[in-house]
Amino acid sequence: MKDLRFGRLKCYSLHLGILPLTVLVLVFFCFVCLSLRSQEWGHPGAVNRKAYPQPRVLTPTRTDVLVLTPWLAPIIWEGTFDIDTLNEQFRLRNTTIGLTVFAVKKYVVFLKLFLETAEQHFMVGHKVIYYVFTDRPADVPQVPLGAGRRLVVLTVRNYTRWQDVSMHRMEVISHFSEQRFRHEVDYLVCADVDMKFRDHVGVEILSALFGTLHPGFYRSRRESFTYERRPQSQAYIPWDQGDFYYMGAFFGGSVVEVHHLTKACHQAMVEDQANGIEAVWHDESHLNKYLLYHKPTKVLSPEYMWDQQLLGWPSIMKKLRYVAVPKNHQAIRN
């Protein structure tokens, strides 16, 4: 009888131990299911039945520019996409886009125009989180935001040299991608603050990994690119290699791919620093090295990075979407 009672007691204790564990597993499973962004099972949502012109296989959308890379990544120009169709696809996925921008030291003066024009032209109709990194949080302007859009201010330290501010951007984005961004957004767009949005910049740019053609080199041969040419640097690219020259002021992709890019660039810069060398164009040099060997899945045309004051407005550019703001570089950087 004693053995029987002891056996029942053990069984009862076992049940008591299993029950909380089962509840914990079920709670965790439900949390994971709810947390999988853009991967919900069930009804795919309402589909837009709007009529649009049929794509014509024998009629290219643009014949004056390259629209496809050798690795089959599209190059995004005006006339190569249907934004209504793309908007519908990304809304069905309930996409949230993060836009990172660094407004450090005197560069905070550009933030108001940047945010105001972003509200007019950047990812209109989609959920957006602006991540503003600054050493002057009190100077961040109050800009009215549309529905589904919010601003997050994140405090960072400043550096004496503007080059160091630029290079440490990679470290900061890498850290926050892993610790925060991956829980809040689906895509990241990393932009310079001393710019303004002049025309539509939308979901046509979104992809696993995208880079933007430098407006000063999109017509040039690789021998003219200002890659880092010293073999001692981790950013080194030989003279006989290179696809395009990418601008460091506008890049992005999925959070995981941006994390990989920024982490690799930061680690390369740390190694260069240990060896007493600094790449010719700092983080941009390392960005170009990374995108040479980790091909972007989309390439943005210079419509998405232009300086009209320096380059005018050539006829090949049907739209100027993201443009430089006139400034005194020396006064701002010092």
Curated annotation (Swiss-Prot):
Q: Which residues are listed as membrane-spanning?
A: 16-36
Q: Where does Mn(2+) bind?
A: 192, 194
> What does the entry comment about cofactor binding?
Binds 1 Mn(2+) ion per subunit.
- Localization in the cell: Golgi apparatus, Golgi stack membrane; Secreted
Source organism (scientific name) = Rattus norvegicus
Which keywords does the record carry?
Glycoprotein, Glycosyltransferase, Golgi apparatus, Manganese, Membrane, Metal-binding, Secreted, Signal-anchor, Transferase, Transmembrane, Transmembrane helix
Q: Which domain of life is it from?
A: Eukaryota
Q: What class of enzyme is it?
A: transferase
Similarity annotation: Belongs to the glycosyltransferase 6 family.
The protein's name: Histo-blood group ABO system transferase 2
Instruction: Note what the entry says on domains.
Output: The conserved DXD motif is involved in cofactor binding. The manganese ion interacts with the beta-phosphate group of UDP and may also have a role in catalysis.
Name of the gene this protein is made from: Abo2
